[in-house]
Amino acid sequence: MFKKILIANRGEIALRIIRACKEMGIRTVAVHSEEDRESLHVKTADESVCIGPAQSSESYLNIPNIISAAEITGADAIHPGYGFLAENSYFAEVCESCNIKFIGPSKEAILKMGDKVQARAIMRKAGVQIIPGSEGVISTVEEALKLVKKIKYPVIVKAAGGGGGKGMRIVQNEDALKNAILTAQNEAKRAFGNPEVYIEKYVEEPRHIEFQIMADSKGDVVYLPERDCSIQRRYQKLLEESPSTFISDKLRKKMGKAACRAARAVKYVTVGTVEFLVDKDGDYYFMEMNTRIQVEHPVSELVTGIDLVKEQIRLAAGERLDVDQDDIQVQGHAIECRVNAEDSEKDFIPSPGKITKFIVPGGPGVRVDSHIYTGYTIPPYYDSMIAKVLPYGHDREEAIIRMQRALSEFIVEGVKTTIPFHRRILENPYFKKGEVYTNFIQKRIIEEPNSKQ
């Protein structure tokens, strides 16, 4: 087992990893930008090292400085968390060359799943259903037109090396196709340095269902109950829950086994997430694999009792899985609301600033993961998430009631937050019935109230 882990991240995930390490008897090193000197992860770790100025490119994305910090402090492993360098295959390679263990999959697995075109080809070969579309990169408009004649409109143009909604365009007709390809290529080039795009059939009103997997170095893979991440705004998740109201036991097993096949196809080790789109008929299609710990991993922890961060560390250290598939069962229901420092009344613009009061909810069945405290100043340079509120209930109804109570107790003063917006979601009758799709926010929260006026 590792003796000292450097956490190459900040905020709540850095704090989450430090807590897991403490329980495992592993010493920790926090890295931080000049802006983050007073952050909670810096105060909580055994050691801390400043790695650069506030801008991420000069600190949390600065590979030489992070490696130097690990070597100076004698860390034998680096945990990348999520975001920043978590899915950077070059960083994983550099760690390996410096004899520092990267807590994640191999650089090869990251590369294969990071290239969406290559990932589709691998999944096709592994027998995992993919959305009908191009077999490779689309180079010309003529090539695109030929393909679309087969799969029909609507289609979606996607960046080959992208994610998070960038480099994506939905196309309803031939007139819009050429412009969509050029726009997506330019956006992908700016965001990812790679202008390549591919085309898929656009699945209308799908659910976004993902499966957490755990895999060891001997090739054993297990899946956890699904997470429903359909509540999104501009492809960014706002609320996740487990289990899904739509997924039957039979479908869960089929999709879970498909997720395991996906992991085995790239010889995946540690924890990861396989994401699917599921249509109204229950047909499911591979979308992508996230080769890291997810923001929403606590949802799965609550319904299984498995500490995913500890398991990630154990598996990276070469230990075997200590659970069989039959040991993993759905227990109750959990929901996560991502609370951001944003003004939902002004198109969700970030709201950085000093927190003058911060009181988190508590009571039975309520977990809050946060790095915020009264007096802390939220910097404008990073992600705006300030807390994850996670109620657990014996069933979905109890989990929703507990979330409503928790959000009503949550006091944040000094900045705007998305708490009022989350409360609107929870009060929506369609959400309560479990009728959620990826266009839920636009259709049921934004457009529907306006249509009644």
Task: List the predicted regions and their residue ranges.
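ATP-binding N-terminal substructure of ATP-dependent carboxylate-amine bond-forming enzymes
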Residues: 1-125, 138-146
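ATP-dependent carboxylate activation and anion-phosphoryl transfer catalytic cores
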Residues: 7-16, 20-23, 48, 71-73, ...
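Structural detector of well-ordered beta-strand residues that form the stable sheet scaffold
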Residues: 29, 79, 101-103, 131, ...
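A cross-family glycoside hydrolase active-site/sugar-binding cleft signature
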Residues: 31, 81, 133, 200, ...
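A polyampholytic, Gly/Pro-enriched intrinsically disordered region
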Residues: 122-131, 153-154
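Acidic/histidine-enriched active-site and ligand-binding environments that engage anionic O-linkages
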Residues: 147-156
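N-terminal nucleotide-binding beta1-loop-alpha1 segment
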Residues: 159
